[in-house]
C-alpha cells in the first residue's frame, strides 16, 4: 500500500516550518504573473507587425517565443519549487512525489507553450504561416494527448525513484494501458495535423506510423509482463515528444 500518511506529514512539515523559504522562492513566479498581461500585449503587437517591411524584424519571432515561455512559466515554476520542497523531506514517498510533481511541471510548460503558439492569430499562424484550421485541430488533439500523459508522468517517476513498488501496482498497470491506448489514437492525428509543407507524403506516413507503433509496443510489453520495462521506455518516449515539440518550434 502507498504510505499516503508520510506524504501528508512531509507536505505539512514543508508548509508549516519552511513557509518563509517557500514564499521567497515563489517571488519569481509572482513577478511573472504580474508582467503576463504586458507580455501578451507585446506578443500581439509583434504578431501584427509580421509581414510589414518597416515594422517587421528578425527579432520578432525569437522574442515572441521567449515571451510565450515566460507567460507559461509561473505555474510550472511553482510546481518545481513544490517538488524541490517535497524532495528534501525525509521519506521515500515524498521524494517520489517530488519527482512526479517536477515531471508534471515540465509537461505543463511544454503543452501550455504549444497551446499558446497554436491559438488563433497566434505565433504559429502569423510567424510560421500555419493555417488556422490546422492549428485548431492540433490544439484539440494535443489537449487529449497531454491529459493522457499526466498519469504516465507519475508512473515514470515511481519507476525511476521507487521501482520496487511497481511489482504490486495493479492500478498503475490499468492506467498505463488506458493512457497508452488514448495516446495511440490521439498522437497520430497530431502528426497528420502538422502542416509540414516541406515534408513528403511518405515522411508524413512514416511519422504517423511511428506515433502508432511507439505506444502500441509499450502496450504489448505491458500486456506480456514487462511492466517495469515499459514504464522506463515510457519516460524516454515522453522526453522524445518534448524534444520533437522543441524542434518543431
Residue ranges and their predicted role:
Residues 2-18:
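Short, aromatic-rich amphipathic segments at membrane interfaces
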Residues 1-2, 249:
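Non-catalytic extracellular/periplasmic "stalk"
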Residues 13-249:
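Hydrophobic/aromatic interaction determinants used to assemble and anchor large protein complexes
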Amino acid at each position: 500500500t502507498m504510505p499516503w500518511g508520510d506524504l501528508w506529514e512531509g507536505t505539512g512539515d514543508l508548509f508549516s516550518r519552511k513557509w518563509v523559504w517557500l514564499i521567497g522562492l515563489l517571488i519569481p513566479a509572482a513577478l511573472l504573473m504580474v508582467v503576463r498581461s504586458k507580455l501578451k500585449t507585446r506578443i500581439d503587437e509583434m504578431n501584427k507587425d509580421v509581414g510589414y517591411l518597416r515594422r517587421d524584424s528578425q527579432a520578432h519571432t525569437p522574442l515572441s517565443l521567449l515571451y510565450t515561455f515566460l507567460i507559461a512559466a509561473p505555474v510550472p515554476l511553482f510546481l518545481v519549487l513544490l517538488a524541490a520542497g517535497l524532495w528534501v523531506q525525509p521519506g521515500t514517498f515524498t521524494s517520489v512525489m517530488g519527482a512526479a510533481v517536477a515531471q508534471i511541471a515540465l509537461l505543463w510548460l511544454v503543452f501550455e507553450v504549444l497551446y499558446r503558439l497554436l491559438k488563433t492569430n497566434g505565433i504559429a499562424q502569423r510567424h510560421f504561416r500555419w493555417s488556422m484550421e490546422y492549428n485548431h485541430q492540433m490544439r484539440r488533439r494535443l489537449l487529449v494527448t497531454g491529459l493522457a500523459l499526466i498519469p504516465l508522468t507519475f508512473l515514470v517517476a515511481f519507476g525511476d525513484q521507487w521501482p520496487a513498488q511497481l511489482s504490486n501496482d495493479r492500478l498503475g498497470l490499468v492506467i498505463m494501458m488506458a493512457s497508452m491506448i488514448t495516446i495511440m489514437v490521439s498522437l497520430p492525428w497530431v502528426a497528420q495535423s502538422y502542416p509540414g509543407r516541406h515534408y513528403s507524403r511518405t515522411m508524413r506516413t512514416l511519422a504517423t506510423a511511428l506515433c502508432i507503433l511507439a505506444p502500441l509496443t509499450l502496450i504489448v510489453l505491458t500486456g506480456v509482463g514487462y511492466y517495469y520495462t515499459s514504464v522506463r521506455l515510457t519516460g524516454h518516449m515522453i522526453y522524445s515528444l518534448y524534444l520533437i515539440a522543441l524542434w518543431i518550434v
